[in-house]
From Swiss-Prot:
<keyword id="KW-0963">Cytoplasm</keyword>
<dbReference type="GO" id="GO:0005737">
    <property type="term" value="C:cytoplasm"/>
</dbReference>
<keyword id="KW-0378">Hydrolase</keyword>
<dbReference type="GO" id="GO:0000049">
    <property type="term" value="F:tRNA binding"/>
</dbReference>
<dbReference type="InterPro" id="IPR003732">
    <property type="entry name" value="Daa-tRNA_deacyls_DTD"/>
</dbReference>
<comment type="similarity">
    <text>Belongs to the DTD family.</text>
</comment>
<keyword id="KW-0820">tRNA-binding</keyword>
<comment type="subunit">
    <text>Homodimer.</text>
</comment>
<protein>
    <recommendedName>
        <fullName>D-aminoacyl-tRNA deacylase</fullName>
        <ecNumber>3.1.1.96</ecNumber>
    </recommendedName>
</protein>
<keyword id="KW-0694">RNA-binding</keyword>
<feature type="short sequence motif" description="Gly-cisPro motif, important for rejection of L-amino acids">
    <location>
        <begin position="133"/>
        <end position="134"/>
    </location>
</feature>
<dbReference type="GO" id="GO:0051500">
    <property type="term" value="F:D-tyrosyl-tRNA(Tyr) deacylase activity"/>
</dbReference>
<dbReference type="GO" id="GO:0106026">
    <property type="term" value="F:Gly-tRNA(Ala) deacylase activity"/>
</dbReference>
<comment type="function">
    <text>An aminoacyl-tRNA editing enzyme that deacylates mischarged D-aminoacyl-tRNAs. Also deacylates mischarged glycyl-tRNA(Ala), protecting cells against glycine mischarging by AlaRS. Acts via tRNA-based rather than protein-based catalysis; rejects L-amino acids rather than detecting D-amino acids in the active site. By recycling D-aminoacyl-tRNA to D-amino acids and free tRNA molecules, this enzyme counteracts the toxicity associated with the formation of D-aminoacyl-tRNA entities in vivo and helps enforce protein L-homochirality.</text>
</comment>
<dbReference type="GO" id="GO:0019478">
    <property type="term" value="P:D-amino acid catabolic process"/>
</dbReference>
<dbReference type="GO" id="GO:0043908">
    <property type="term" value="F:Ser(Gly)-tRNA(Ala) hydrolase activity"/>
</dbReference>
<dbReference type="Pfam" id="PF02580">
    <property type="entry name" value="Tyr_Deacylase"/>
</dbReference>
């Protein structure tokens, strides 16, 4: 499981021009990629990291700050570009496998007290964000 975490001063995701998820003020955007072998162990580890990582201003976590996390599924995090000019995504989990894992991550974050907004799994989304810092961190489990 792979998460690209970005510290933001604002973020939102739109589907068909409609806002479906938003973080107002400081927070994090978590772009999440899943492989077929990912499960409860990876979800628990990454939920803890996302919730407790002290990457907001003044060395605070989203829990410390009461900040939100916008979770966006992104299978392209597992692009394989080693051959040719067109990436393949064979390492990414198919939707029936990946969607419940992303849902479990969202639920695990909420159980930790994190305010979570989401995109729509599998939708063509427009993600608008203002990266703060910039701070971008790759988490893997």
């Amino acid at each position: 499981m792979r998460v690209v975490l970005q510290r933001v001063s604002r973020a939102r995701v739109l589907v068909d021009g409609q806002v479906v998820g938003e973080v107002s003020g400081e927070g994090l955007v978590a772009f999440v990629g899943v492989t077929p072998g990912d499960g409860a162990g990876e979800v628990a580890l990454l939920a803890r990291k996302i919730a407790e990582l002290r990457v907001l201003r003044d060395e605070r976590s989203v829990l410390d700050a009461g900040a939100g996390v916008l979770v966006v599924s992104q299978f392209t995090l597992y692009a394989d570009t080693r051959k040719g000019r067109r990436p393949t995504w064979s390492a990414a989990a198919p939707r029936p496998v990946a969607e419940p894992v992303v849902d479990a991550l969202v639920e695990a974050l909420r159980e930790r007290g994190v305010v979570v907004a989401t995109g729509v799994f599998g939708a063509d989304m427009a993600v608008e964000l203002t990266n703060d810092g910039p701070v971008t961190i790759l988490l893997e489990a």
